């Protein structure tokens, strides 16, 4: 399938702008390992221009053009963007699939979610107008008070490659709804659809500088964005190591951050489940998006009474997954995003075997695919809690397995992690599911499923999985500053100080 990759520049101040140093980066199709295009590579010089453009857009006309415009005004732009995404859905899905390797069906689903996210935050932007000047109940009748919610300012956004456009929009849509202006730095491994978002913003007439998009390396564009003194907040999705570095940079300026970082999430399967249904949700929880999901439920805890039957079916189902070029009909597992990621996944599985674990299937290149960064999904059993594959995030199609005998043991094993992003519990006993949901040390819990995500529900983790919440009303609050206004309404003087004697 011939797909034309548009040649774009950086998007700064509403204009396509060549990088100051004229650097570029190759775009590699992970299914073929071929270079299919180039993206501009921003550096600190371009970050300066983008921050200046965002700052001007925020303050233009005393903020009346954007930051202090009504939510209804901003909502019109968000809805126009959503309509354009649907209009260009096929093109955007093709670019997403060829850029990051996810199956085309998944990429198309992502585009629906992108449009839905813009629509959702358009509604919330309109609702924000009615929430201004919310009255406060004060204990003294000589005062009245109210609350103002104001955009936090210029926001820097650094986003990952597993959901290149969708996870960018999780940040862009609520920030624009709130009245912020933004600089988006997508991952250098998958930036094509984010550049097309810039083109859509240009088409709908989004005011110049409201959204600026810089592609490039994290060290050359992301780091100077995170440490820039005129960026009011940083939001980041990615590795815990990078998130820690961003926190360090922000701390020097007392700059707020929201971080959605790594995960090693558990899925607990009790012995009263429908095994076929549970097997499919277990697979979906770990192998969806080619296994490259921050919330992947990649630690399977299965009750010992059903473990043999469950694993037998799980291996058979997993071997039946269609692994192919993302554009082949019925593809359910494409390549991982890059050579580095491919080598990382293979090494994790190899190390597990060397540590004494049993590889039930996968963890190697499929025999029928001689090129591309393809990995057969791996299922690894006989793991111990000290093994690397149990404790560290693989970010690829690799599932490790342990058995348990009691509910308490399952919960203890589930929470035995430095991460706390998500967890899943599968059981027909809903009271037990409720107990386990409360016991999980995680920000997201799935009951009798794994991975469904809706823009109406909050998203984020605990422990080393980060802090702050995206999506839902919480996602909008992420970009708002709360101001309290208190007014003295009595006709009488305050009377605290004795007035000077009259002469």
UniProtKB/Swiss-Prot annotation:
Optimum pH is 9.75 with 4-aminobutanal as substrate. Optimum pH is 9.5 with 3-aminopropanal as substrate. The keyword tRNA processing does not apply. Transmembrane segments: none annotated. One of its GO terms (molecular function) is gamma-guanidinobutyraldehyde dehydrogenase (NAD+) activity. Disruption phenotype: No visible phenotype under normal growth conditions. Mutant seedlings exhibit increased sensitivity to salt stress. NAD(+) binds at residues 238-245, 294, 393. A motif (Microbody targeting signal) lies at residues 501-503. Belongs to the aldehyde dehydrogenase family. This is Aminoaldehyde dehydrogenase ALDH10A9, peroxisomal. It comes from Arabidopsis thaliana (Mouse-ear cress). The gene is ALDH10A9.
């Amino acid at each position: 399938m011939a797909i034309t990759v548009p040649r774009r520049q950086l998007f700064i101040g509403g204009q396509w702008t060549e990088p100051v140093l004229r650097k570029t980066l190759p775009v590699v199709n992970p299914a073929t390992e071929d270079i299919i295009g180039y993206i501009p590579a921003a550096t600190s010089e371009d970050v300066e221009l983008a921050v200046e453009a965002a700052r001007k857009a925020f303050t233009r006309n005393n903020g009346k053009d954007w930051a202090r415009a009504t939510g209804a005004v901003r909502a019109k732009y968000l809805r126009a963007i959503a309509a354009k995404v649907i209009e260009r859905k096929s093109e955007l899905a093709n670019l997403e699939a060829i850029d990051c390797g996810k199956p085309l069906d998944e990429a198309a689903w992502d585009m629906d979610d992108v449009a839905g996210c813009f629509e959702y935050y358009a509604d919330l932007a309109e609702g924000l107008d009615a929430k201004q000047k919310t009255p406060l109940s004060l204990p003294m009748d000589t005062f009245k008070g109210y609350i103002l919610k104001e955009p936090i300012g210029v926001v820097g956004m650094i986003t990952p490659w597993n959901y290149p456009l969708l996870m960018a929009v999780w940040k862009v849509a609520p920030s624009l709804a709130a009245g912020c202006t933004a600089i988006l730095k997508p991952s250098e491994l998958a930036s094509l659809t984010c550049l097309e978002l810039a083109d859509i913003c240009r088409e709908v007439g989004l005011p110049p500088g409201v959204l600026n998009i810089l592609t490039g390396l994290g060290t050359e564009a992301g780091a100077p964005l995170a440490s820039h003194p005129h960026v009011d907040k940083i939001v980041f999705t990615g590795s815990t190591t990078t998130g820690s570095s961003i926190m360090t940079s922000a701390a020097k300026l007392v700059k707020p951050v929201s971080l959605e970082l790594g995960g090693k999430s558990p899925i607990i399967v009790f012995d009263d489940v429908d095994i076929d249904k549970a097997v499919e949700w277990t697979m979906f929880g770990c192998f969806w998006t080619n296994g490259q999901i921050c919330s992947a439920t990649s630690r399977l805890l299965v009750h010992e009474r059903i473990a043999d039957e469950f694993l037998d079916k799980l291996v058979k189902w997993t071997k039946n997954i269609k692994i192919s070029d993302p554009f082949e009909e019925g593809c359910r597992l494409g390549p991982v995003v890059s050579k580095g990621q491919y080598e990382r996944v293979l090494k994790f599985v190899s190390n597990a075997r060397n540590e004494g674990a049993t590889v039930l299937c996968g963890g190697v290149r499929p025999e029928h695919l001689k090129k591309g960064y393809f990995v057969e999904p791996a299922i690894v059993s006989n793991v111990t809690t000290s093994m690397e594959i149990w404790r560290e995030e693989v970010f690829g199609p690799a599932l490790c397995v342990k058995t348990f005998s009691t509910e308490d043991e399952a919960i203890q094993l589930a929470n035995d992690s430095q991460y706390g992003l998500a967890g899943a519990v599968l059981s027909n006993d809903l009271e037990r599911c409720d107990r386990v949901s409360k016991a999980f040390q995680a920000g997201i819990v799935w009951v009798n499923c794994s991975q469904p995500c809706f823009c109406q529900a909050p998203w984020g983790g605990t422990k080393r999985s980060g802090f702050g919440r995206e999506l839902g009303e919480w996602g909008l609050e992420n970009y708002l500053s709360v101001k309290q206004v208190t007014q003295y309404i009595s006709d009488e003087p305050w009377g605290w100080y004795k007035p000077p004697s009259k002469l």
